[in-house]
Swiss-Prot record:
Residues that bind Mn(2+) 2: D58, D102
Biological role stated in the UniProt entry: Pycsar (pyrimidine cyclase system for antiphage resistance) provides immunity against bacteriophage. The pyrimidine cyclase (PycC) synthesizes cyclic nucleotides in response to infection; these serve as specific second messenger signals. The signals activate the adjacent effector, leading to bacterial cell death and abortive phage infection. A clade D Pycsar system.
Cellular component per GO, a single term: cytoplasm
Binding site for Mn(2+) 1: D58, D102
EC class (word): lyase
GO MF annotations, alphabetized: lyase activity; metal ion binding; nucleotide binding
Gene: pycC
UniProt record similarity statement: Belongs to the adenylyl cyclase class-4/guanylyl cyclase family. Pyrimidine cyclase subfamily.
Keyword Transmembrane helix found: no
Protein name, UniProt field: Uridylate cyclase
């Protein structure tokens, strides 16, 4: 039987709060490189990443998937979805992965972090559309409409290991907008869709392999559609994001994915399509202002370094 001295417990945690708030913790700037295995739990030290990209993957209608099914069937659906997502994160060298119920999130930092994160996100939605859901629907009749929803965001992050020392009850805690905004983006996506914040779009929009349709037809910049991420606060430039409904092309997908990971940005078959689309987008006062806000915020970040 569990016995708890409630007064002593509350006094203990209250004392911890008082100690924590009595002075500011130390923040160590780690630039773009971080080894999470070295994070302390007792020392009042937070490590700062100058930029990290968060990718969140959620399973639509997950709470309904277990209705009228055996427990083993529900477990199989969760394993198929989440297991596939985690494997994809691993293949794209995610620096940190956490599983959360019906989904998972990953953080990418360091060299080619945006390339790895965006390619991982597109691969997850491709897996959802072309592999996961067709197999689920083939096996179970009357399955609720489901599939993976993906969101991306980026920002500087603070991290510290938090929990109970010398027990398994401890995890890294990530403070910053990246994970929160990626989760909000994923919430607004539908199944097989990827929603990215404005900051992520600023990077994607400069890459022909990502911003323009493939060579199966005439290259077209209408691959991504405008979206306002409603749960991101008004006045934050990241609120004006983009939605991707397409998946990797069976013909050109492997080539384009490899090109992005190699750091390539330009295609010979793309001339003015991408830049013309960006110029048209900037005619919108709302999106133009959001882009300028993001540019100003980036300048402030760089000035603090």
């Amino acid at each position: 039987m569990t016995e708890v001295d409630l007064k002593a417990l509350l006094a203990d945690v209250d004392g911890d709060v008082a100690t924590e708030l009595a002075s500011k913790p130390e923040v160590i700037d780690k630039g773009h490189e971080l080894d999470i295995s070295t994070l302390p739990i007792q020392a009042r030290k937070w490590h700062k990443l100058r930029d990290a990209v968060a990718v969140v993957a959620d399973l639509k209608s997950s709470t309904q998937l277990g209705l009228n099914k055996h427990a083993a069937s529900t477990a199989s659906i969760y394993e198929a979805a989440t297991g596939g997502v985690v494997q994809i994160f691993d293949e794209f060298d995610a620096n940190f992965v956490a599983i959360q119920g019906d989904g998972a999130f990953a953080l990418f930092w360091g060299d080619k972090r945006r390339q790895r994160a965006v390619c991982a996100g597109i691969t997850i939605k491709t897996f959802s559309f072309k592999h996961l859901v067709p197999r689920l629907e083939k096996k179970w009749d009357g399955l609720p409409e489901t599939g993976l929803k993906v969101g991306l965001g980026s920002s500087p992050l603070l991290v510290k290991r938090v929990g109970v020392p010398r027990t398994e009850h401890q995890e890294p805690v990530w403070a910053g907008r990246a994970v929160n905004y990626a989760a909000k983006a994923a919430q607004q996506a539908d199944r097989h869709e990827m929603v990215v914040t404005g900051t992520i779009w600023d990077w994607v929009s400069d890459n022909d392999f990502l911003a323009v349709t493939c060579s199966c037809s005439n290259p077209n910049p209408d691959l991504w559609s405008n979206i306002t991420i409603e749960k991101i606060p008004d006045g934050d430039g990241d609120r004006e994001g983009k939605r991707l409904t397409s998946s990797w092309c069976d013909v050109h997908g492997p080539e384009y994915c490899a090109a992005v990971l190699e750091g390539k940005k330009r295609r010979a078959d793309v001339t003015t399509q991408r830049t013309s689309a960006l110029a048209a987008e900037m005619k919108s006062w709302v999106r133009n202002k959001a882009a300028q806000d993001r540019k100003n915020r980036l300048a402030r970040y760089q000035g603090l370094h």
